[in-house]
Amino acid sequence: MTWKPIICLAALVLSASAIPVDNNVEGEPEVECGPNSITVNFNTRNPFEGHVYVKGLYDQAGCRSDEGGRQVAGIELPFDSCNTARTRSLNPKGVFVSTTVVISFHPQFVTKVDRAYRIQCFYMESDKTVSTQIEVSDLTTAFQTQVVPMPVCKYEILDGGPSGQPIQFATIGQQVYHKWTCDSETTDTFCAVVHSCTVDDGNGDTVQILNEEGCALDKFLLNNLEYPTDLMAGQEAHVYKYADRSQLFYQCQISITIKDPGSECARPTCSEPQGFGAVKQAGAGGAHAAAAPQAGVEEVQAAPVAAAAPVAAPVAAAAAAPAVPRATLAQLRLLRKKRSFGENEGILDVRVEINTLDIMEGASPSAPEAAALVSEESVRRRATSTGICLTPIGFASFLGIGTIVATALSATIFYVARPTSHKH
């Protein structure tokens, strides 16, 4: 009858002596942004016995590094694999290459000392100036250019509606608001149009939900966008997820164009989307999430030449051109600005991530109801944990002792309360 308390005592001793893995990351990760890949190295306090892998791709070949015996652990990730995402930026001008890397110190499990890092490299596009020498026999007209910074854009998923807070976690069916916003230092200068939106699970399964014109493809996933201002777009939606994945990665393109004076920004003309019209993209794991590395570098280096070439021409033209009205000069400057936007010059990428909780059994509750259920369940567990647990033998013993005590108490009360007999 004494074996159960002994086992419980042993369990308490084991839980008290359990300690975390005796290792951790020393300092910050060392990131090397190469021309074809990103290399991440970690310095550890003790010799490393574990794994370094891309989040969500533990079992994919080439996306995990198994290290052992050294105090340095690392991994090299090519641009065209392992869900390495590439996003274009107009301000600052260049390309962001990003991924999430996990360092795990246990050979089999994720423990409390493990860490996940969001790694990002920025490849800036350098500006090149093309000049030429001319001989002028008469008075020349100076040419002055003022550079207007491009807008800075972001993509957010808000809770409930346009005024909600950005969220990273949601339940299936929860109402959210997809919001695209561009901030500009000037007013009435630029127009923004959102298009080419996709959603993927981080493992190559990519579905297009907005086409190249900015029209919705599946009304159950996302409806046609609304444009409250020149540089803002949004639409309400409900949270969904892949069958066996909790993460969703949304990526869209935003086209920035010059706004014509006195006119409205052009918006996509879209018909009402049908249900189940989203297009699954074949082979999107590497091509969409991360474009070919060398092509990305060539794009960064070659674009400034095409953008800067028209600079020299106005100088020569201005020397020989007669005086023209100020309004005509303004129109010419506007045309020059538009011509400076070459192919893909005014297009940038925005990306956002959301984690979804799986569907609950029975009726599907809303987010507040789900929170209430979780709170109620925790209260029930706390109330249960304050009770007394007995084995069947212990319960029988407790019941027997209680019966004896109750019988003795009843006999005592009967003896005390009985009437006193009188002698005759």
Curated annotation (Swiss-Prot):
- Mind listing the UniProt keywords for this protein, alphabetically? Cell membrane, Cuticle, Disulfide bond, Membrane, Repeat, Secreted, Signal, Transmembrane, Transmembrane helix
Major location, coarse class? membrane
Q: Where in the cell is it found?
A: Cell membrane; Secreted
Asked if the Swiss-Prot or TrEMBL record annotates the protein with the keyword Transmembrane helix, the reply is yes
Q: Which GO terms describe its molecular function?
A: structural constituent of cuticle
Q: Span of the secretion signal?
A: 1-18
Give the span(s) annotated as 4 X 4 AA repeats of A-A-P-[AVI].
302-323
Q: Which residues lie on this side of the membrane: Cytoplasmic?
A: 414-424
**What's a GO cellular component annotated to this UniProt protein?**
cuticular extracellular matrix
Tagged with keyword Cell cycle = no
**Annotated disulfide bonds:** 197-252
Membrane topology reported for the UniProt record: Single-pass type I membrane protein
Q: Short name of one Pfam family for this protein?
A: CUT_C
Extracellular-side segments:
19-392
Q: Entry's SMART domains?
A: ZP
Transmembrane spans: 393-413
Q: Which PANTHER family match?
A: CUTICLIN-1 (PTHR22907:SF51), GH04558P (PTHR22907)
Please provide the record's free-text comment about the domains of this protein.
The small repeats A-A-P-[AVI] are also present in many proteins constituting the protective envelope of other species.
Q: What does this protein do?
A: Component of the cuticles, which contributes to the formation of extracellular envelopes protecting the organism from the environment. Plays a role in alae formation in dauer larvae.
Q: What is this protein called?
A: Cuticlin-1
What's the gene?
Answer: cut-1
